[in-house]
Amino acid sequence: LREDKKAKGATAKQLNQMEQENPLTPSEAFGSTGSNIFPIQELKAQRDIVKNRGLNDLRGQNGKLSLDPSLGVIFNVDLKKNLTRIDSMTVNEDEIGCLTVYERPIENAPKGLYKIGYDPVRQDSGTSLVSYVVYKSNMKGVSNFYNDNIVAIYIGRNETNDDNHRIGELLAMWYNTQVMYENEVPDVKTYFQRRKLLSLLALQPDGVISKAVKKSTVSRIYGCHMTTQLRDAGEKYIKDWLLQICEYDEEGKPVMRLNKIYNLRLLDELIGYDRLQATRYDVISALIMAIFQVQEEYIDKEFEDKSDKNKGKSLLKAYKSLLGG
């Protein structure tokens, strides 16, 4: 019946609804239709491609970061396969996870090219997971396969929160950028302050907040407090990003941003996302933090463009006044 509907041109939304009502597999039952605005059918197709072709291993390298006094930050690739990458929503308590890198930072990376989003845990004990997402934005003069895409993801949990924050410190140094984090967890700032590294933390995205929350008053603080309105805005930003066409393949078919996601955990989170259980979706929360930084740049650019236009009009008016026009 489902194949008949598909052959007759049923929409992705209709097919997803059928999967929820008549699931053939547990993964189909896992998907959510109520509060999930992401393109589920397209994401499922991408997940199947990643699984069948082993793209998570082909495109990404697992490893750990360390700091060398002479060489700076070093990425130590897990050649002996000692680390366990978390690929699914079901996690064993002894799995600490690892960093997966899809693209290392380019040489002499300009400040602001990369964005880091961080979803911290609230206490040392517990089963919640930490997630970091490193996003490479699009900057003039920088051309590469991963522009406007995710270049690294960490998903896991260390024994102490200091160890969790240390990952963000090294990522920020390696990619020459700052970390945007959910600031409901106060010890993130405390850690970086103690390390005299507050410059590695991103300031609150005032433009994004003002646009998402009416009558918002903002002050310059580190990180971002995730309100309902901001999560709603973040979800919409992610949806728009997923569906962006970035190129066309050899057959002339469009390639979307979601077709360049190779992390199975993120794909599963996007497919099964439920706003009512948002705290379960660690990578999405980190991605929202990264996307907010991208959007903040767009909003700042729009403001600058408008300011330039207004300045131009004022100069023209003044010039005409001098000419007696």
Walk through the language-model features, giving the residues of each.
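RNase H-like, metal-dependent nuclease domains and their acidic two-metal-ion catalytic environment used
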Residues: 1-204, 245-325
